[in-house]
């Protein structure tokens, strides 16, 4: 029997728009046509380093606030950085960003932090 892969989805939504995006992401990740993937969903304020260490892949969702990621996502990244450093090298991740413009500020700020964890962005 093939071991299931683990996908962790972490997001933050204050107004509900990123939550609506996350619902679509979660629906896609849990599609019955996709086999062998176990999905866990966590709010950014509740997600932990243990959740990240469990995962084989990570999806992060954030609104862009003032050209930056949400404070809750930054807080999540601050909490998991050192416990996960050197333990998740090469883990694939992707972002979904809800923004009134192109979301570049949030994407750049998250990408800069995640480069330090040596995980690999996929598109």
Task: Describe the residue ranges of each PLM region.
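Helix-loop-strand module that forms the ligand-binding subsite of alpha/beta enzymes
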Residues: 44-121
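Generic alpha-helical hydrophobic packing signal
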Residues: 23-26, 42, 55
């Amino acid at each position: 029997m093939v071991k299931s892969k683990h996908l962790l989805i972490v997001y933050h939504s204050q107004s509900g728009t990123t939550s609506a995006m996350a619902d679509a992401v979660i629906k896609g990740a849990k599609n019955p046509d996709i086999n062998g993937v176990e999905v866990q969903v966590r709010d950014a304020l509740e997600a932990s380093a243990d959740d990240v260490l469990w995962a084989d892949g990570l999806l992060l969702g954030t609104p862009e606030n003032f050209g930056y990621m949400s404070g809750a996502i930054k807080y999540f990244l601050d909490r998991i950085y050192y416990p996960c450093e050197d333990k998740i090298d090469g883990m694939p991740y992707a972002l979904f960003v809800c923004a009134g413009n192109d979301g570049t500020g949030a994407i750049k700020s998250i990408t800069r932090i995640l480069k330090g964890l040596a995980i690999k962005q996929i598109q």
